[in-house]
Amino acid sequence: MQTRLEPITFITGNKKKLEEVQAIIPYVHAKSMELPEIQSLDMREVVAYKIKHALAQCNAPIIVEDTAVYMDCLKSQDGTPGLPGPFVKWFLETIGNRQLYEIACCFNNMRAYGKTVVGYAPDAYTILFFEGEVHGTIVEPTGEQGFGWDFVFKPDSCGVTLGSLPLEERIKCNQRGIAVQKLKEYLEKG
């Protein structure tokens, strides 16, 4: 079992994600590597696939995460969570935050939720999942603090967008902060 003094490698090239994780678990360090990212609506499947490929290049213990935003206006008729989901990175690269907001406006449905799945591999044979989910609304882009879709997402628990909050406040009310806090609590039990 991992103890809180043993370093954990967070597989990411995203410095902002690393800052959020290290604000909760300071003994995490990053390793940037190119990992194949399968196209799946199942976030646990995406995370497990990344972990499998990361473990081929570095030793456990490692963590990998995947984050999504689901817009109610783009959910399927059968109620399946809406787009962009885990494809949000490519949505933002293609259309940006302003257009994400405008899509919600066109449907007159601003409701959305953010979700993060953190996968923790304490060894080469085990993957544990920790999830965080935050409900809120898509709003006109504001803020200068966050990254990605933080500028258009206002959690129900906050009066402003995630992009308007400093790191210490953002991790208290975003989905990644919730998931990483669950991982921290698990590690500290050991």
Tell where the protein language model's regions lie, with residue ranges.
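Anionic-ligand binding patches
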Residues: 2-9, 16-190
